[in-house]
Amino acid sequence: MLFDTHAHLNAEQYDTDLEEVIERAKAEKVERIVVVGFDRPTITRAMEMIEEYDFIYAAIGWHPVDAIDMTEEDLAWIKELSAHEKVVAIGEMGLDYHWDKSPKDIQKEVFRNQIALAKEVNLPIIIHNRDATEDVVTILKEEGAEAVGGIMHCFTGSAEVARECMKMNFYLSFGGPVTFKNAKKPKEVVKEIPNDRLLIETDCPFLTPHPFRGKRNEPSYVKYVAEQIAELKEMTFEEIASITTENAKRLFRIN
């Protein structure tokens, strides 16, 4: 009934109680989860998890903060792994100008290389954008990303940016921040965008929704995101759960 399109259950924060976290997700009717890998260790763990759990799928890519560490061998490795039937997207990828570990020019190169790879293997992409909207949108356009489409992960941008992304065949995914009291912009965007472009996520263990803000996030909390969106859209929780699940299945080509 619920589909968490972006989770990091491969993070060390779940090393001691992963089974309990998964049981709570099932109890809240979270039927599918995409676990996102963004470097060698997290990709390796995501690939293990898709073998261990039938309802978990993987997205594999390289996070922009760590772009400086990515090698040609890493890109080739991701390409090889992407042939697995339960790898449903390339990413997360993108640009992050909040942290300065990786220079902007290297981030851009790694971003472009991953878009090219996704087009080659015909998989959608998952976009991480922090303080870099203009450059992200420009690169998506220049690299012809609309050929594969994908997700603007944890979208907090303006309605204008949302429209530009949707024109390029992207879905907008909302997480915990849409439940925050001061989140005026994402709430307005949720009201405006068509239902067939809407996804939900947790980005756990980060960005925990109200009323658990400040604690470790987990997939069961995606219901609070769905509840908030239902309220904003003046729809029922069940309608939003169904719409966002069908959208995710369509994007990821899951029957």
Swiss-Prot record:
E.C. designation(s): 3.1.-.-
The name of this protein is Uncharacterized metal-dependent hydrolase YabD
Instruction: Name the cofactor(s) required for activity, per the record.
Output: a divalent metal cation
Name the PROSITE patterns for this protein.
TATD_1, TATD_2, TATD_3
Q: Which organism is it from?
A: Bacillus subtilis (strain 168)
Provide the cofactor note recorded for this chain's UniProt entry. Binds 2 divalent metal cations per subunit.
**Superkingdom assignment:** Bacteria
Q: Which UniProt keywords apply?
A: Hydrolase, Metal-binding
For this UniProt entry, what's an example GO CC term?
cytosol
